[in-house]
């Protein structure tokens, strides 16, 4: 009996630490997915460096209380799987949202984004954002535009002066 309780405590600690450490956590209902679909989902999440696990709701509830994310308890009914990402905030939301579009059986329930409990709508809005690299490239192109325009204007003036001088 004691070893079972100790094992459960370890699992609760594991879930709580993942909830605290992850930048983004998404809770999904995977009922209705067959084995090959779940395997494909796990593969896509693994490629995005996202951990995907199924835990008992009672242990998850205790971990949620430890992590002080009590707003999640309302979503912990039925079979749930949890996707954790410690690197990218957008990755789990994007992969799960894209997968849910193709497989109606997968339902996004809620999430934790940078320590804040988020609704399904917020998770889906996050999924529509470009990745960090995409946002950085957009920012870089916006920052380069004035310099590029100045260089083109200077080149045009130089060519015009050259034509007038010739």
Curated annotation (Swiss-Prot):
Induction: In response to low temperature and salt stress. GO terms for biological process: translation. One of its GO terms (cellular component) is cytosolic large ribosomal subunit. Keywords: Ribonucleoprotein, Ribosomal protein, RNA-binding, rRNA-binding, Stress response. Gene3D superfamilies: 3.30.70.1730. One of its GO terms (molecular function) is structural constituent of ribosome. The keyword Nuclease does not apply. Coiled coil: none annotated. SUPFAM superfamilies: Ribosomal protein L10-like. Forms part of the ribosomal stalk, playing a central role in the interaction of the ribosome with GTP-bound translation factors (such as IF-2, EF-Tu, EF-G and RF3). Part of the ribosomal stalk of the 50S ribosomal subunit. The N-terminus interacts with L11 and 23S rRNA to form the base of the stalk. The C-terminus forms an elongated spine to which L12 dimers bind in a sequential fashion forming a pentameric L10(L12)2(L12)2 complex. Belongs to the universal ribosomal protein uL10 family. HAMAP family: Ribosomal_uL10 (MF_00362). This is Large ribosomal subunit protein uL10. The lineage of its organism: Bacteria, Bacillati, Bacillota, Bacilli, Bacillales. The gene is rplJ.
């Amino acid at each position: 009996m004691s070893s079972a309780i100790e094992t459960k405590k370890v699992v609760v600690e594991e879930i709580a630490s993942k909830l605290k450490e992850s930048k983004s956590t998404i809770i999904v209902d995977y009922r209705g997915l067959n084995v090959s679909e779940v395997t494909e989902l796990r593969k896509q999440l693994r490629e995005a460096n996202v951990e995907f696990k199924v835990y008992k709701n009672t242990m998850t509830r205790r971990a949620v209380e430890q992590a002080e994310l009590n707003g999640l308890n309302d979503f912990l009914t039925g079979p749930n799987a949890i996707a954790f990402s410690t690197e990218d905030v957008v990755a789990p939301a994007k992969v799960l949202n894209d997968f849910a579009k193709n497989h109606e059986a997968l339902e996004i329930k809620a999430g934790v984004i940078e320590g804040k409990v988020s609704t399904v709508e917020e998770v889906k809005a996050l999924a529509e954002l470009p990745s960090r690299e995409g946002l950085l490239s957009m920012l870089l192109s916006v920052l380069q535009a004035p310099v590029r325009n100045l260089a083109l204007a200077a080149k045009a003036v130089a060519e015009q002066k050259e034509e007038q001088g010739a």
